[in-house]
Amino acid sequence: MDNKIIVALDYETEYEALSFVDQVDPSLCRVKVGKEMFTTLGTNFVKQLHERKFDVFLDLKYHDIPNTVARAVRSAADLGVWMVDLHASGGLTMMEEAKKILEPYGKDAPLLIAVTVLTSMEDLDLLQIGINASPMEQVIRLAHLAQRAGLDGVVCSPQEVEVLRTHCGKDFKLVTPGIRPEGSDVGDQRRIMTPKQAIETGSDYLVIGRPITQAQDPLSVLKSINASIR
């Protein structure tokens, strides 16, 4: 079964993170390791997650010159992660070289996903960095660029999924943060949606953090979310 839930492991210590993953079942979710945890704990932490049979989304959002990003993506593949991402705004050549370096890995290559517009950003935020376009317009532009580069999909807000399905087709993976079960705190992400709404709209994978990781009974919450999207 293709797990649609990716749990964001946003903890300050290895003990807290491993205590959480030991409470849940790798058949019910995948896990995401971001910049903070990877910078603190490194590759050994990812290996410990693999030992527990979890698929890992390495969410480091690479953005650098093409050669540097390609080598970083290769290192992620050598680590055995399931998914890795980079910033589409790094350009076509950067994305093409990152995809090309994965060719020798064949079916064992991680999914290579592009970040389009961060879910915390709105029109004014884009304007302040010199982009005179709405988040939706910029997402479409960057998604087309990522698809042209041969990437597997993009990270986008749930509200952009339906439009991207039209523009990029059914096989282009759509990974959606900004997912909050009903009754959850919105936090710092402005463009949000419930798991059920996101799947019905066409999301492939849902990134969910605090509603699961800060729950008194995370396994029950995870089971409930999975039940809601079946």
From Swiss-Prot:
The record, for SMART domains, names: OMPdecase
Cross-referenced HAMAP family, in alphabetical order? OMPdecase_type1_B
PROSITE patterns given for it? Answer: OMPDECASE
> Does Lyase show up as a keyword for this record?
yes
Q: Please provide the record's keywords in A-Z order.
A: Decarboxylase, Lyase, Pyrimidine biosynthesis
Enzyme Commission code(s) on record? 4.1.1.23
Can you name this protein? Orotidine 5'-phosphate decarboxylase
* Coiled-coil residues: none
Where does this protein hold substrate? Answer: 10, 32, 59-68, 119, 180, 189, 209-210
> In the UniProt record, does the keyword Lyase occur?
yes
| Description of how the protein assembles with itself and partners | Homodimer.
Its family remark reads: Belongs to the OMP decarboxylase family. Type 1 subfamily.
One Pfam family from the record: OMPdecase
Listed under catalytic activity are:
orotidine 5'-phosphate + H(+) = UMP + CO2
Q: Where is the active site?
A: 61 (proton donor)
